UniProtKB/Swiss-Prot annotation:
Belongs to the acetyltransferase family. MshD subfamily. Acetyl-CoA 1 binds at L80, V81, V82, R88, R89, G90, I91, G92, T93. One of its GO terms (molecular function) is protein-N-terminal-alanine acetyltransferase activity. One of its GO terms (biological process) is cellular response to hydrogen peroxide. 1D-myo-inositol 2-(L-cysteinylamino)-2-deoxy-alpha-D-glucopyranoside binds at E36, E179, K224, E234, Y282. It comes from Mycobacterium tuberculosis (strain ATCC 25618 / H37Rv). It is an enzyme of class 2 (transferase). SUPFAM superfamilies: Acyl-CoA N-acyltransferases (Nat) (SSF55729). This is Mycothiol acetyltransferase. Disulfide bonds: none annotated. Acetyl-CoA 2 binds at residues 238-240, 245-251, 287-292.
Amino acid sequence: MTALDWRSALTADEQRSVRALVTATTAVDGVAPVGEQVLRELGQQRTEHLLVAGSRPGGPIIGYLNLSPPRGAGGAMAELVVHPQSRRRGIGTAMARAALAKTAGRNQFWAHGTLDPARATASALGLVGVRELIQMRRPLRDIPEPTIPDGVVIRTYAGTSDDAELLRVNNAAFAGHPEQGGWTAVQLAERRGEAWFDPDGLILAFGDSPRERPGRLLGFHWTKVHPDHPGLGEVYVLGVDPAAQRRGLGQMLTSIGIVSLARRLGGRKTLDPAVEPAVLLYVESDNVAAVRTYQSLGFTTYSVDTAYALAGTDN
């Protein structure tokens, strides 16, 4: 097998090769092997990159692993992909072992879709599932009409003047969350720069009563229309200020966002005429209350992503 090559940065050609690898693998597996944050990191120097090149000099990359640094009390996070035509050669196992060696065993691995090759690799390395992220979907029809309670005003994102309140609520709602917590203006700016960003898709709920501080954000629903998947929208981030919980804001914001997605996707056709437009979301499997709320809104389980770690480690 070709040698493993750790990098702190990737050239433009290497970035393109990794993106092509991800695209080819997604087409075969039906699920992206890495999350969008990994693609966002290809041009940065905030994570480490492990490359496996093909046997032909100057040929395409056939294996890639991204290793992000630890956040908070948790360990590092790795995501990897092997070209479908290069599987069963030990490349994935070798990359995973290299990541474990670099972190002294203190890292997790995301397995998107929890596919058979990922389960087999995890078993061979003595890894066990430590976290599950459920993808749920529902069709964009028969949407419950949202009811906006008294004392709440809804509007969409007006620009960077909203950022301070947006960050305050996000970081309070996701305190301790490994991916969504601890955001700064950098994370917001990166997402505003994405091709899919639409200010009308970022829905904000403000308090409007004598007891509320003027301009206080109660919650938000950041929706996303997938440019590469016609007819598919996403509940990208839904956050409610912990101090404003138990007021039905989460369900209200979810419904408003779904209505917004249905309006924006109404004229778009899916790649498969037999598949109707839909909205997806991700939720932690142990967040039972959220799962039940989404089920009550018509969402059902579509797939499950699993985070694996060495058995017996505190990851």
